[in-house]
Amino acid sequence: MAGKKKSKSDSLPLDLDNIKPLDHLQPVPKTRSSSITSIESVDEPGTMKQVLLPPTIREFDELDQFESFVRDETWDNDFDYFHGKLHYYPPFVMKSCQNNLEKIKPTMNKNSKKFRRDLHHHIQKHLIKDLEKCCGYELNFGKGEIVETDNKVTWKFKDETDHGFSKEEEDLYDRHWRLELDVSCTNESAMVDVEYKSIPM
């Protein structure tokens, strides 16, 4: 990817036990202004209004890379404006096949009660807790919602709280944001998809 700046995660390995929490908010980065564009207002035709473009989607195929990306967004003061996707085999799958992808059982998918139970445990006890460390602030996703179709199951989580900061501090810097986390698997494989968004409000 020509033109992309070298990320901190290229040189600094992820250490979940030594990530410094985000103690205080800061002003919105000046670079954010390049993501603002003008569009015609739907409510008042003929008038223009400024909107923030969606952040660039970054895609990953390893959990460590994805978590490093989330950590780096906090370090770069972009914790309230990012969008990452992860397509991976969860650790419990890799452990069961002893890190040999050819040994993954074809029954390891959304139709297996054991697979779903293990994935739900991984989401609640590992993924969300690790993302909270990487973000550096509180995540309040609660139980979430499970949406199921014939070939896919998705756990949907949303956090619209103050993330552990005071309302005064959020108002001072105009830093109000919501988080959306979707984790899904299909009936075709043990591969899991994660979509994680931080959206300014």
From Swiss-Prot:
UniProt cross-references to Pfam families, sorted A to Z: RGI1
Chief place of localization: membrane
Keyword line: Cell membrane, Membrane
GO cellular component: plasma membrane
GO biological process, one term: energy reserve metabolic process
Domain of life: Eukaryota
Positions of region (Disordered): 1-38
Topology in the lipid bilayer: Peripheral membrane protein
UniProt entry tagged with the keyword Repeat: no
Compartment(s): Cell membrane
Function: Involved in the control of energetic metabolism and significantly contribute to cell fitness, especially under respiratory growth conditions.
Family note: Belongs to the RGI1 family.
Protein name as annotated: Respiratory growth induced protein 1
Phylogenetic lineage: Eukaryota, Fungi, Dikarya, Ascomycota, Saccharomycotina
